[in-house]
């Protein structure tokens, strides 16, 4: 088996023009694996730490030279001569070297970039596609599925400079027979939505994740214009296409209340749960992410009891891809799904452990990008290699989003029918 002979870190830019970390892992046979760490805007307070320099004279303090130095110094020294295919040992060694609960010493961005780059190098060394190597690491060799894309076509909240409080309004092509057909459906809806917004005299500028970011009369108005676009594209809402929300409610949780400032409404936890329930009764919304604040577990229990039987309730800021927090949620019957983001936890091994724990408990797992992305498409391979069944990777424009969709098209073609697209059955209800 090949050995690691060099590791290189560098500062590159993400899709928001902010620095992030890229790592190369070089093997003794000349193979190089490269990976970039993404970055979030609406972040959970318990996420692993993204190490930034804080030097206001460079990149407004957002430089990552400290994280890069940790890759080129202590992480490189630690991993030289090790086997890149032993992912668990490699990741655990970095976790031990860091020595903190949230990877604050080395930086989760440094550790993650090396973790993923090593996986890519190991896959190449074994002459395997990355998704196949991930399936092996996951203990499910040769088992794959194509994910249903959750396409974020209207952006609000922290992802846009508009008056829409809810962060993401998504369409899911659940009636498609394949991923490629689903991607086409979503793309057609996206273009019809642009026409609907133009006809209303609304902005068609896009947000961080490529969705349109108009000012709207209410959050529900976003659902109305999307419904119109679905119909104009020739699809049936509720059958061909369903809807999903990412409320990112922690971003508008103030003094124990949920403040939808864009439409001048303030709710208690139970009141906001009822508001969301009402939306699910008026529209075919089958998934809601971060419907309540990450610390409002009592509110989450209310929401789960109200609509959890029929609606996928996804914990993002709530669980932060952390098995300790997820286990607590499972034990308390809070939510029924987890959003999976590599950089919330910081290694591939811990990411796989979170997916496995969720599935064992009957929770779904949704693989996700971050709002600050790069051309790195690893999450596409993760979704297929773990048979997660769902992926969130933004809208149908911006290359940082489309790169993941294009990688999924390549994988589907390569697998040639060996990975099923399960559509509506991936969701509850």
UniProtKB/Swiss-Prot annotation:
UniProt: (2R)-2-phosphoglycerate binding residues: 167, 341, 370-371, 392
Gene Ontology biological process terms from the UniProt entry: glycolytic process
Entry annotation: catalytic residues: 209, 341
Binding-site residues, Mg(2+): 246, 289, 316
Compartments it resides in: Cytoplasm; Secreted; Cell surface
Reactions catalysed, as given in the entry: (2R)-2-phosphoglycerate = phosphoenolpyruvate + H2O
SMART domains the UniProt entry points to: Enolase_C (SM01192), Enolase_N (SM01193)
Predominant cellular place of this UniProt entry's protein: cytoplasm
Coiled-coil spans in chain: none
PROSITE patterns xref list: ENOLASE
Entry's Gene Ontology molecular function annotations: magnesium ion binding; phosphopyruvate hydratase activity
Cofactor note (record): Binds a second Mg(2+) ion via substrate during catalysis.
NCBIfam families: eno
Family membership noted in the UniProt record: Belongs to the enolase family.
Protein name (record): Enolase
């Amino acid at each position: 088996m090949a050995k690691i002979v060099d590791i290189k870190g560098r500062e590159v830019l993400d899709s928001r023009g902010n620095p992030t970390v890229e790592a190369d892992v070089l093997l003794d046979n000349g193979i190089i694996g490269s990976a970039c760490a993404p970055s979030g805007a609406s972040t959970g307070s318990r996420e692993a730490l993204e190490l930034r320099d804080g030097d206001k004279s460079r990149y407004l303090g957002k430089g990552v030279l400290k994280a890069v130095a940790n890759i080129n110094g202590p992480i490189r020294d630690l991993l030289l001569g090790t086997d890149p295919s032993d992912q668990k040992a490699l990741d655990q060694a970095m976790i031990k070297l860091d020595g903190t609960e949230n990877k604050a010493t080395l930086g989760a961005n440094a550790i993650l970039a090396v973790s993923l780059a090593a996986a890519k190098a190991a896959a190449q060394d074994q002459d395997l596609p990355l998704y196949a190597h991930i399936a092996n690491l996951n203990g499910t060799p040769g088992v794959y599925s194509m994910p249903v894309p959750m396409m974020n076509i209207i952006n609000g909240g922290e992802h846009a400079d508009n008056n829409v409080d809810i962060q993401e309004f998504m369409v899911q092509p659940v009636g498609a027979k394949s991923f490629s057909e689903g991607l086409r459906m979503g793309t057609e809806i996206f273009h019809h939505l642009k026409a609907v917004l133009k006809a209303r005299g609304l902005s068609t500028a896009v947000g961080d994740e490529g969705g349109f970011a108009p000012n709207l009369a209410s959050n529900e108005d976003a659902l109305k214009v999307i419904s119109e676009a679905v119909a104009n594209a020739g699809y049936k809402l509720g059958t061909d296409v369903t809807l999903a929300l990412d409320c990112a409610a922690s971003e508008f949780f103030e003094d124990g209340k949920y403040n939808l400032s864009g439409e001048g409404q303030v709710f208690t936890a139970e009141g906001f749960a009822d508001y969301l329930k009402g939306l699910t009764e008026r529209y075919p919304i089958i998934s809601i992410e971060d419907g309540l604040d990450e610390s409002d577990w009592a509110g989450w229990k209310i929401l789960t009891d109200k609509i959890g039987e029929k609606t996928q309730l996804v914990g993002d800021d709530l669980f932060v891809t952390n098995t300790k927090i997820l286990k607590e949620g499972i034990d308390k019957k809070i939510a029924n799904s987890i959003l999976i983001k590599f950089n919330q936890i910081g290694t591939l091994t811990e990411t796989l452990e979170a997916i496995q724990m969720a599935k064992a408990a009957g929770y779904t797992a949704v693989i996700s990008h971050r709002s600050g992305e790069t051309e790195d498409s690893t999450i596409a391979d993760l979704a297929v290699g773990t048979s997660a069944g769902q992926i969130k990777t933004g809208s149908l424009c911006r290359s940082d989003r489309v790169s993941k969709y294009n990688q999924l098209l390549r994988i589907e073609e390569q697998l040639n029918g060996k990975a099923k697209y399960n559509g509506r059955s991936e969701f509850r209800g």
